[in-house]
Each structure stands twice: as structure tokens, then as C-alpha cells.
A protein has these predicted regions:
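Cysteine endopeptidase catalytic domains of the caspase/legumain-like
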Residues: 1-159
């Protein structure tokens, strides 16, 4: 259905242009986009907690736009810029980005108190939380968001 959503979440290792599985397996972002673009829903959201995850846009060069590459239906929220690490915390049991996404979806990102979390609200919360927690490190982390503006007001969760 048109209102359905696909949510893809990856937390693990990353390198420029790809997420990294176990062993020598690489899954390039362009392959993720290619597979997800075939879905009928126009609402696809990918969360990537991996080093260099901001490199998802590296293939979107001057010859085409991100919207053309994704059919204007995929939004990526990435843990870091293309040249940054994505930090983990052993006491949290996951990365700062994953932790912020979870806290945000559980209500912390509800900026206007309407008991709904939109993509824009979640990103604003995640960005503030992660940059604050990593600002004193040698390599601060800056989450990234790219996708069609029509996705920014899509409600990801409500209660």
C-alpha cells in the first residue's frame, strides 16, 4: 500500500561506499538502493550505524541527483560523514547513533509533544545527541540525512 513503510537498519562495520559484513563480504550502498528501489511503497527509510556511512551519497555525482538515483522514495539517516568513524560504547551495548535513534523513537524526539515522531524530528534529536556525546573525542561524529523533502514529515512512530 502507498502508506506502507520499509525500514532497513544496519549496525556494524562500514567503509567508503559499502557496509561490511562478516569476512570479506561488502554490500555497496548502490546495491542497497537498487534493491530497495524496486519496492512499491514510496516510503523507504534506511538507518546505517557504521563508519564512513555518509559515503552513501558518493555515487550521486554531477551526472544525476539523489532523487533520480533512488526514485525519490529512499531516505538514508547515517551515523557519520563520509570521512568519520561511528563510535560505539561498551556500556550502551551499541553505537551512539543506534542509541540515539532508539531513544528518539521511544519519545525523546517528540519536539512538539504531539505523540508522533517524524523523520525531521528524529534527525534533529539524533544529530544533537550524537554530536554532543562525541564532541570531546579526537574524532567527533556528525550524523547525516539525505532523501526527498517529502519524507521529512513522514511519521515513523506514534503512540
Amino acid at each position: 500500500k502507498a502508506e506502507d513503510k520499509i525500514i532497513f537498519f544496519f549496525s556494524g562495520h562500514g567503509t567508503a561506499g559499502s557496509i561490511v559484513g562478516y569476512g570479506p563480504m561488502l554490500l555497496p550502498y548502490k546495491e542497497i538502493v537498487k534493491k530497495l528501489s524496486t519496492a512499491r511503497t514510496p516510503n523507504i527509510f534506511c538507518f546505517v550505524d557504521a563508519c564512513k556511512s555518509g559515503s552513501v551519497t558518493d555515487d550521486a555525482g554531477s551526472n544525476y541527483t539523489w532523487g533520480q538515483a533512488t526514485g525519490n522514495k529512499i531516505t538514508f539517516m547515517m551515523a557519520s560523514r563520509s570521512n568519520e568513524l561511528s563510535w560505539e560504547n561498551q556500556w550502551l551495548g551499541n553505537g551512539f547513533f543506534s542509541q540515539a535513534v532508539l531513544k528518539g523513537l521511544r519519545g525523546k524526539a517528540d519536539a512538539n509533544g504531539d505523540r508522533k515522531i517524524t523523520v525531521a524530528e528524529l534527525y534533529k534529536y539524533v544529530y544533537a545527541d550524537v554530536t554532543e556525546r562525541t564532541k570531546s573525542s579526537e574524532a567527533p561524529q556528525h550524523p547525516q540525512l539525505i532523501g526527498p523533502k517529502s519524507h521529512f514529515n513522514v511519521v515513523l512512530t506514534k503512540w
